[in-house]
């Protein structure tokens, strides 16, 4: 893997003592790089003390830098390298440790291997699943690109499960239909048993090794380098040796994943801390729709580990304490394969009404033991293992205790379907020059208010590729990289120094736990105004407590105390925007279910014919995207709104799906 650890080796031999500070100057040292950095294309990286003599900064120059090396980041990075761009990929984890590896169920594409299918039907299902908050131009792009994207993965060597005649096996998944919702259940989810994310990530990583991409592994991105409204790279901390690095680039792609760890119980890795989302917030740019947090119906009770929707796609059913298949009452047609927000709310209602399972009656059961053992062994081997380890359940004999668990963030950094980051000025979308985003960190918005299962892996590969294509359309390899100020990134280093020597009264772990429990209690599956208001006050108070943090490790080498504190800052910014956005949205839509505002508020009442109705003004309905900003010093959240894009990329080829009452 080209470039891994090369930058760390630049400073090796000048390591800090665990409790020491950086020396004021660094002796010159040459180190052979295969990639180009600095003004002299053959020179090694430059060390500058323009920011601080205590924290010398190593400067690098690339055509493009990708932050994050999960599915989206890898696809963007090797797409850029393939096009000839001198590309850096910066990641706080080794690439195959990224959270993409945890995805289980599959990736949607209308291949038609199990029955006739059409990408336009997939488009319809995704728009409906989004509760008409998704942007239909982006959904059009994603669903049309889906079949080719899956074939591309197959050509890269991804070992999909197969039908008897050798085609890619496709299972049923929630919210998927044929013939625009009128043809029954679709089998559209391509899978590798129940380990699809693992296979996808390793396939993309293996593919990336073909290209001359420079990987900065175990580097923590601190902030974007912004000049005159343009993004010109990132500043990062090398976790291994504590060195600071400014990576200057004409194009920056954020692919840092979601912020699931704002909640106490979630299926996300502990590294899902919204780093990119927070960097954009600190840059003064908006985030979009953060109030829409998906609760996956089936997290293992007490552990939060994911049990894939593929279990229900293979024939598993949800039952209550009376042994009743209760989803038949809530979604008579789709039943257990209704969309995730519908199933999670139904489970919560069953528990509330006293039909929960166990001594506390606080969960339900997922039953699989009626399925043939050979089907469980071949299609759901990972789930069988996970259920035994985390619940002590043999799925061939007994049901799995499950509970809705935070799983995915529909909101993120606002982009168009090309991956270009947007801001909204005077009622118009404007592109932020040099900045792109993809994957769960981004909000295109293809998921709207609720994501369909197996659309997330599709999102990664389609929009990771889209970012690379967009950059290739507008730039050429070797284009001049815009300059940055000599002290660019100074505030980031000052913040790092402040946290490193923080000597307050609250531990990072204590404050993080308080935040997570507050989010879990105040912004859950069902929400109510008074509780949300209390949550806003609580999270604002906790944000203020950041100045009272106490860290214990004063060193710079593998200072995990410092890294976790930096992550907590990022989580706090995400939590603030999530709960304030939820309190402000006075309706129920998708994953945002208000008990005091139970109906969806559109520009028309779509439960009735719209003829004769007067369209509500923009300020009086909620079919619009939330844009949130945070004052970093005070924690004050400011909300604005932008309209949903209803037009597709080609109305003649793919007609807009008009809003309707959503039922399954």
Swiss-Prot record:
Binding site for FAD: 69, 72, 91-92, 98, 100, 105, 221, 275, 440, 456-457
SUPFAM superfamilies tied to this protein: FAD/NAD(P)-binding domain, Succinate dehydrogenase/fumarate reductase flavoprotein C-terminal domain, Succinate dehydrogenase/fumarate reductase flavoprotein, catalytic domain
Domain of life: Eukaryota
Claim: Transport is one of the keywords in the record: yes
Mitochondrion keyword on record: yes
Enzyme Commission numbers on file: 1.3.5.1, 1.1.5.-
Post-translational modification: Acetylation of Lys-498 and Lys-538 is observed in liver mitochondria from fasted mice but not from fed mice. Deacetylated by SIRT3.
Subunit structure: Component of complex II composed of four subunits: the flavoprotein (FP) SDHA, iron-sulfur protein (IP) SDHB, and a cytochrome b560 composed of SDHC and SDHD. Interacts with SDHAF2/SDH5; interaction is required for FAD attachment. Interacts with TRAP1. Interacts with LACC1.
Name of the molecule in the record: Succinate dehydrogenase [ubiquinone] flavoprotein subunit, mitochondrial
UniProt organism field: Mus musculus
């Amino acid at each position: 893997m080209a470039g891994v650890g090369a930058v760390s080796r630049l400073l090796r031999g000048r390591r800090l003592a665990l409790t020491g500070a950086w020396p004021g100057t660094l002796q010159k040292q040459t180190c052979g790089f295969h990639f180009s950095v600095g003004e002299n294309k053959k020179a090694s990286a430059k060390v500058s003390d323009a920011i601080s003599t205590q924290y010398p900064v190593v400067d690098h120059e690339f055509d493009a830098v990708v932050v994050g090396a999960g599915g989206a980041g890898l696809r963007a990075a090797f797409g850029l390298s393939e096009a000839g761009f001198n590309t850096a990929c910066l990641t706080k984890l080794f690439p195959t440790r990224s959270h993409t590896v945890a995805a289980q169920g599959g990736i949607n594409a209308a291949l038609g291997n199990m029955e006739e299918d059409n990408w336009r039907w997939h488009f319809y299902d995704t728009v409906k699943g989004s509760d008409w908050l998704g942007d239909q131009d982006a959904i059009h792009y994603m669903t049309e690109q889906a079949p080719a994207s899956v074939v591309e993965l197959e050509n890269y060597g991804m070992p999909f499960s197969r039908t008897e005649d050798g085609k890619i096996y496709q299972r049923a998944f929630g919210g998927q239909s044929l013939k625009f919702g009128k043809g029954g259940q679709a089998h559209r989810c391509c899978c590798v048993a129940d380990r699809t994310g693992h296979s996808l990530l390793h396939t993309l990583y293996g593919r990336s090794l073909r290209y001359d991409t420079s990987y900065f592994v175990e580097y923590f991105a601190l902030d974007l380098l912004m000049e005159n409204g343009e993004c010109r790279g990132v500043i990062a901390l090398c976790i291994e040796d504590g060195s600071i690095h400014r990576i200057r680039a004409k194009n920056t792609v954020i692919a840092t994943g979601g912020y699931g760890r704002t909640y106490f119980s979630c299926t996300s890795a502990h590294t899902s801390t919204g780093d990119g989302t927070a960097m954009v917030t600190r840059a003064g740019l908006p985030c979009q729709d953060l109030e829409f947090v998906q609760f996956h119906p089936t997290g293992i009770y007490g552990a939060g580990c994911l049990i894939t929707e593929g279990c229900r796609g293979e024939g598993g059913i949800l039952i209550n304490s009376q042994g009743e298949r209760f989803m038949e009452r809530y979604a008579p047609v789709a039943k257990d394969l209704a969309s995730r927000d519908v199933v999670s709310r139904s489970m919560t209602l069953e528990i509330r009404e006293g039909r929960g399972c166990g001594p506390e009656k606080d969960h339900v059961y997922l039953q699989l033991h009626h399925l043939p053992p050979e089907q469980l062994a071949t299609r759901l081997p990972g789930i069988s293992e996970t259920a035994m380890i985390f619940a002590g359940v043999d799925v061939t004999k007994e049901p799995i205790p499950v509970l809705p668990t935070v799983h995915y963030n529909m909101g993120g950094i606002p982009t168009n379907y090309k991956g270009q980051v947007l801001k909204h000025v005077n009622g118009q979308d404007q592109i932020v020059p040099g900045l792109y985003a993809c994957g769960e960190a981004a909000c295109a918005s293809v998921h709207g208010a609720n994501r369909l299962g197996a659309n997330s892996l599709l999102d990664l590969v389609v929009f990771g590729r889209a970012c690379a294509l967009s950059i290739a359309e507008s730039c050429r390899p070797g284009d001049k990289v815009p300059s940055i100020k000599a002290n660019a990134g100074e505030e980031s280093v000052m913040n790092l120094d402040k946290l490193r020597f923080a000597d307050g009264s609250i531990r990072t772990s204590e404050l993080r736990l308080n935040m997570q429990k507050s989010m879990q209690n105040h912004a859950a599956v069902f929400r109510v105004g008074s509780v949300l208001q209390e949550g806003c006050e609580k999270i604002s108070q906790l944000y203020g407590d950041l100045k009272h943090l106490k860290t214990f490790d004063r060193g710079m080498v593998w200072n995990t105390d410092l890294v976790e504190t930096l992550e907590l800052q990022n989580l706090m910014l995400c939590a603030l925007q999530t709960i304030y956005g939820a309190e402000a949205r006075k309706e129920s839509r998708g994953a945002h279910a208000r008990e005091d505002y139970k109906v969806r508020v559109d520009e028309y009442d779509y439960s009735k014919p719209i003829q004769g109705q007067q369209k509500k003004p923009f300020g009086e309905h909620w079919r619009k995207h939330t844009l949130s900003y945070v004052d970093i010093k005070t924690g004050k959240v400011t909300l604005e709104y932008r309209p949903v894009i209803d037009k597709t990329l080609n109305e003649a080829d793919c007609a807009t799906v008009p809003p309707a009452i959503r039922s399954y």
